[in-house]
Each structure stands twice: as C-alpha cells, then as structure tokens.
Amino acid sequence: MGEEATAVAAAGVRPELVREAEVSLLECKVCFERFGHWQQRRPRNLPCGHVVCLACVAALAHPRTLGLECPFCRRACRACDTSDCLPVLHLLELLGSTLHASPAALSAAPFAPGTLTCYHAFGGWGTLVNPTGLALCPKTGRVVVVHDGKRRVKIFDSGGGGAHQFGEKGDAAHDVKYPLDVAVTNDCHVVVTDAGDCSLKVFDFFGQIKLVVGKQFSLPWGVEITPHNGVLVTDAEAGTLHLLEADFPEGVLRRIERLQAHLCSPRGLAVSWLTGAIAVLEHPCAFGRTGCNNTRVKVFNSTMQLIGQVDSFGLNLLFPSKVTASAVTFDHQGNVIVADTSGPAIVCLGKPEEFPALKPIITHGLSRPVALAFTKENSLLVLDTASHSIKVFKVMEGNGG
C-alpha cells in the first residue's frame, strides 16, 4: 500500500478518490473483476444503463439466441444491443498508472498456453502446392501433408526433410483426385478424404492402397483418428459425423456408424487424447448465401453429448476483430485451439466447459492457416496454405505458458 500511495500522490490524485473510483466505478459488480481495456474486461453498457464487463455479457447471453437479462433490474436485451461504456473507459485512461493490477485477474490470466514463436519452417512453393491437410504419425513423428501437386500425399521427417510422396493425380480408384484432409492411424496408415470421388482412401506409408470407402459419403471432409484407432469423418454436404472401424493392414472395413446428424456443413475435426472429447468445426453458411463466413465450434464428450459450443459472433464479443475459424485441434491440456484466417492468428478457446474464453497464442508470421497439429514435444505445426509451407511454433524462453 505504501508504494501505491506514493505513486498516486506523485500523479497528483487523492488516494481516497482513487480507491473510491476503483470500488464504485471501475469494478464489474457481477464478477467483481476490475474493468480494463483488454477485451474480456471492457465495460459494456446494457440498454437499461447498468454496466458489466464483456466477459459477463458473454457468460449471461444464451448461446443460440444471445438473449440475456440485466442481473440488476432484469430488463431483457440481446448481447448485440450492448455497447462500450465510454465514460468508464475515459476514467481508466485518466487514472492510468495510478491503478494497480487486480491479483485475481493476474492469477486467472494464464488459462491457456503461452505465446508461441516460429522457430522453423519447411515446404514452400514447388515442394507443396496449395496444401489443404496436415497430420502427424503418432509412432514416428513424421509429418504428412495433402496438397495439389502431381502426387497428392507428401511425407516429411520430423525435421522437415527427406520427403517422399505418393497418391497420383488421376481417375483410377486408387488415385487421389482432390484431397481435403489427412490423418495417420496408430499403426501408420495414411487416411485421405477425397472430394473428387467422395471417398475415403487408406494407404500404407509406402503409398500402397489398402482400402477405399465410397458411396457412404456425399462430401467427406475432415478426418481424425481416435485413441482406439477408429476413423472419424465429417460429411460436409450430408451434415453428419461418422465413425469407421477397419483392419487397415488387411484392408477390411469392419463397421461404419453415424455418430451425429443435422450438423451444419461440418469440416474440421479434432479428438482430445486426454479426455476423448471431439471438436467439430461447422460452416453454417457454406451452402447458403454468398459472403457469409460465420463458423461454429461444437465440442462433444466421448459419449457424443454436446458440452460446449461457440460461434463467430460469440468470439467477436471477446475479440476486437472478426474470427473466422478454419481449423481446430486440442492441445495436451485439453484446450481447444483454432486457426483464424481473418486475423490471421491462432487462438486458444480454453476448455469446452469454459466457453466462451479466448486468448491469442500466435499473432504474427501467418498468412492463411488451414490446419494444426501438436507434436509430442508440445510444438505446434501450422499449415499455411498461402505460403505453401508448414511453420513450427513453440514456447520460447521468457514467453511464459
């Protein structure tokens, strides 16, 4: 308190006035956190005149209708009817450095991974052409990418060198026409979704075709492997999520099960090996009006119960610029991580039960991120289709995390 009083006196402001302002004016009366300029703590005017922080607006709002009631007078409104409370923001600027940081806010801040820094990149134009999907081999750490080259599947070693490729561009059943995504099974088989003939194709690591699954899909898009070596596939046109079980070495499909229906153009897909949760990235306007780039992340638990969801509008309440999710993954702590092509950026949404929460972890060095994968060493691989490359990010010393 002595240092705080000295700073206040040096600024020419009476300490008792600052303390009164902090308690009466500069504190959200719902969560009791201090207002601030960073997005979650920005003061927001409700239509009734009461002021709460943006994080509380998002928490109070209904996830679909965005309707909420003022916690003080119970007047109904919508989240989009709120606005920045300029008098409180101006008061924050006037008091400036005389305010000290809230210990609760400081302790709550690091809910997500620290800021990541790019320390390596590989691929590039010619080596890769308009890449669309990225996966890691769980046994060898090799990096598998699907792209628009003459041979559609390219495999790099863990350092980005020693590439070999397969999957000829052609019309034969074992060729790959238009790959959208890729995954690698626990026994090192490469699974590719092919929009060209609406099929799922499985290869061994030498490029030998093992299995082709067609007719069951209208437009297979995202693909991911479960901890039990099942294959999850989203069908963007049918709005479904399927689970396939197969004997990959023998090339025998054991069964296929529809886990979810009535999804809105599901594309990206991720599985948490920590909790078994499944994240699906929807594009509600994909087959609707042009110019609409709204996206939605839905997270289901291992029994396919919905445990969290957030869409572009909800994220925009917490972030100053529009967020358009293009890829989703889980980190090793179970946080949901999305690639944002509007930023461009990589953003942590927190754990599903914490939605909506948001923390940018990569804000520089990207052009158009379209796929994400975490290594066992906790580095994050980002497939940047605009630069035709894979960029490797990790927490550097001094960045926290």
From Swiss-Prot:
SUPFAM superfamilies tied to this protein: NHL repeat, RING/U-box
Subcellular location: Endoplasmic reticulum; Nucleus
SMART domains, alphabetized: RING
Reactions that this protein is recorded to catalyse: S-ubiquitinyl-[E2 ubiquitin-conjugating enzyme]-L-cysteine + [acceptor protein]-L-lysine = [E2 ubiquitin-conjugating enzyme]-L-cysteine + N(6)-ubiquitinyl-[acceptor protein]-L-lysine
GO molecular function: ubiquitin protein ligase activity; ubiquitin-protein transferase activity; zinc ion binding
Traits of the deletion mutant: Significant impairment of motor activity, coordination and balance; spontaneous myoclonic seizures; and decreases in episodic memory. 3- and 6-month old mice contain numerous large insoluble aggregates composed mainly of polyglucosans called Lafora bodies (LBs) in skeletal muscle, liver, heart and brain. Glycogen levels are increased 1.6-fold and 1.2-fold respectively in skeletal muscle and liver of 6-month old mice. Glycogen phosphate levels are increased 1.5-fold in skeletal muscle and liver of 6-month old mice.
Keywords for this protein: Autophagy, Endoplasmic reticulum, Metal-binding, Nucleus, Repeat, Transferase, Ubl conjugation pathway, Zinc, Zinc-finger
UniProt repeat feature NHL, residue ranges: 115-159, 163-206, 207-247, 250-303, 304-352, 353-396
Pathway field: Protein modification; protein ubiquitination
Gene Ontology CC: cytosol; endoplasmic reticulum; nucleoplasm; nucleus; perinuclear region of cytoplasm
Renumbered zinc finger spans (RING-type): 28-74
EC number, as in UniProt: 2.3.2.27
Keyword Nucleus (UniProt): yes
GO biological process, alphabetically ordered: autophagy; glycogen biosynthetic process; glycogen metabolic process; positive regulation of protein ubiquitination; proteasome-mediated ubiquitin-dependent protein catabolic process; protein polyubiquitination; protein ubiquitination; regulation of gene expression
Record comment regarding domains: The RING domain is essential for ubiquitin E3 ligase activity.
Function recorded in the entry: E3 ubiquitin-protein ligase. Together with the phosphatase EPM2A/laforin, appears to be involved in the clearance of toxic polyglucosan and protein aggregates via multiple pathways. In complex with EPM2A/laforin and HSP70, suppresses the cellular toxicity of misfolded proteins by promoting their degradation through the ubiquitin-proteasome system (UPS). Ubiquitinates the glycogen-targeting protein phosphatase subunits PPP1R3C/PTG and PPP1R3D in a laforin-dependent manner and targets them for proteasome-dependent degradation, thus decreasing glycogen accumulation.
Subunit structure: Interacts with AGL. Interacts (via the NHL repeats) with EPM2A/laforin. Forms a complex with EPM2A/laforin and HSP70. Interacts with PRDM8.
Name by which UniProt lists this protein: E3 ubiquitin-protein ligase NHLRC1
Source organism of the structure: Mus musculus
Lineage of producing organism: Eukaryota, Metazoa, Chordata, Craniata, Vertebrata
The encoding gene: Nhlrc1
